[in-house]
Amino acid sequence: MVDGVPAPPGTVQAPDPSIGTGTGPSSDVASGLGPGRVVLVGAGPGDVELLTCKAARLIGEADWLVHDALVQPEVLALARRARIIAVGKRAGNPSARQSSINQILLDCAQRGGLTVRLKGGDPLIFARAQEELDVLHAAGVPVEVVPGISSAQAAHAALAMPMTERGRRRALVLATPQVHASDQRNTAALPLPVMPPPMDLQQAAAPVPPSRRKVLSAAEIVADPELRRWAEAIVAAGSGTLYMAATVSDQVRDTLLALGMPPETPTLWMVDVSLPEQAMVPGVLGTLQPPPAALKGKPALLLVGVVPPDVRRTEAP
């Protein structure tokens, strides 16, 4: 991190010298006197004050810290002794491959000490945690998961609106409409990595072009029983929260309408949830559009069917 700005993907660095040496594990640990362990930690929605006490403690104790792009500089500043490795993934931008991230975690564990895998929000919600857990378990690495406040929770808290309500909202739907080229591939038979020899961490974290996504029409989604499940769940519940929907808002709109959701259903884009620059863009499903251009590239949630009547549009900066 330089002048409070997090490193780009592919960077291996120490924190600012004023807050720690960032040298990684001590020589005793690195020499193999104790096995390394990995903890998947939720960094919360953004506001550093929404970090859990346990998460803050582990970040401060970490020897290696492998973090996503959405983790705020104020959170990274808590890593007073860790070697920091940025492996952020952002839609449409070069990022580290998931397979490379898996190998980095294995290598850090082999080198000893505590590795914190820091993920935005909660590490078990749309964060590809299962792939990392599978690899770590297969290699015999001790692993733990520390939950975090999800962006969906923070969004509803910002609205002072419960996610469930007795007699009205009996189901809670968190979904993503994104479809990747590898989603239909059977990965069950693929061999899981074993503990690798030490590698060049900076080379392993090097960014590559963004992964290929399938751009499907609403008709294709509706015709596929598996791909339409997220939409069926929202229609059945009458409401839901969508992650990673900003680049496929047309498909979201058309799919929900095709499955019978009323066009007057309220919608609300929430951007930079929990941060001072948080923005809200209300609308209705029938005319749903992506967030304004001024908010493009920022983390956004789409709330469907749960917007309180007194929400007023927050103009984009």
For the regions a language model picked out, list residue spans one by one:
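Metal-ion/cofactor- or nucleotide/acyl-coenzyme-handling active-site neighborhoods
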Residues: 4-6, 16, 159-161, 166, ...
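Short, glycine-/small-residue-rich phosphate/pyrophosphate-handling segment
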Residues: 156, 160-187, 214-220
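Class I S-adenosyl-L-methionine
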Residues: 1-20, 24-48, 53-149, 153-154, ...
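Short hydrophobic/aromatic-enriched beta-strand-loop microsegments
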Residues: 83-89, 140-144, 163-170, 260-269
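A contiguous loop/helix-start segment that scaffolds small-molecule binding in enzyme catalytic cores
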Residues: 2-11, 20, 35-38, 110-115, ...
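Acidic/glycine-enriched edge-of-secondary-structure segments
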Residues: 83-97, 172-176, 197-212, 240-242
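Conserved beta-alpha
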Residues: 145-152, 171-181, 306-317
